[in-house]
Amino acid sequence: MKKKDIINFVILIIVIAYAAYSYYNKTYDYNETEFLMDTIVNIKVEIKSKDAEKVVSNTFDLMRELENKLSCYQTASEISKFNADEIESLKLDEDLKDIFAISSKLYSESDSLYDITIGRLADLWDFENEVIPSEDKILESIEMVGFDRLEFTDEIVRKPAGMKLNLGSLAKGYIIDKAVDFLKLNGIESGFVNAGGDIRIFGQKKPLKIGIQHPRSERGELSGTLSVTNFSVVTSGDYERFFIKDGIRYHHILNPKTGYPADTAVSVTVISKQAVLADAYSTALFLLNPQQAINLANEIAEIDAIVFYLENNEIKSLQTENMKQYMN
């Protein structure tokens, strides 16, 4: 074989090999959306084959399974049975151990304002029918709040009769994290999980722009945008579930010490590698006064945050030292 023919043959082999590599490593975007956790959940990923589409469907199955476990609104869940005093103790599997460990940490850091034993108080407030509970009912419910009253062993947790848990301030973030873990474990390298605006991005090379809803404007009007790569972004705001009566805004983020909606912030956005931390801290920081919230956030290496609050009817903000690198 002549030298020229050898060179041409080698080039041909390289071209074929590259074409084969490109074919088998070709990716395309795949979207799937379902209604879970009382919101619209969207999973968008880069995949290489139709087989990977099944992974996304299985991810939704996992999320649904976790929702059924952690929800206090699913009557068949162990949490609901525990809340109804149908069972004396709640068995702690790995998911619940994680949930309670995070809850305990934030309870301590927030001067007892972040409290997942707020379930009975939360049940009092009817935001759909715009009902303000009576003072007597609120005081009665406050008596049933207190994370430090839970009794733990290695395997179970017990509570006082009448106390109710509500994991709504961190369950969504926890489920998002588990969904991302499952996707990655099954070969999905890049994408995001978005549950009603609570989002976790993974495997992305380029930053994704995330809008921060303006707390006093129409839906879709922004107070700013973030550019993030492989982070979670979660916002808690007093504009999500609320009603206004006699000029007072009543919203769903309740202060467990007063029994009424917190009047400290109007919106808190938290960035973290873990969605569960972004979710939980967005509530915890909301319950603190703005300066306390930012002081705490600056001490927590795993998060950055921006707090919007009202001062003389004007919206102002405070942010952590590192937050500006994400702001546009």
Go through each PLM region and give its residues.
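Mature catalytic core of soluble alpha/beta enzymes
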Residues: K2-N328
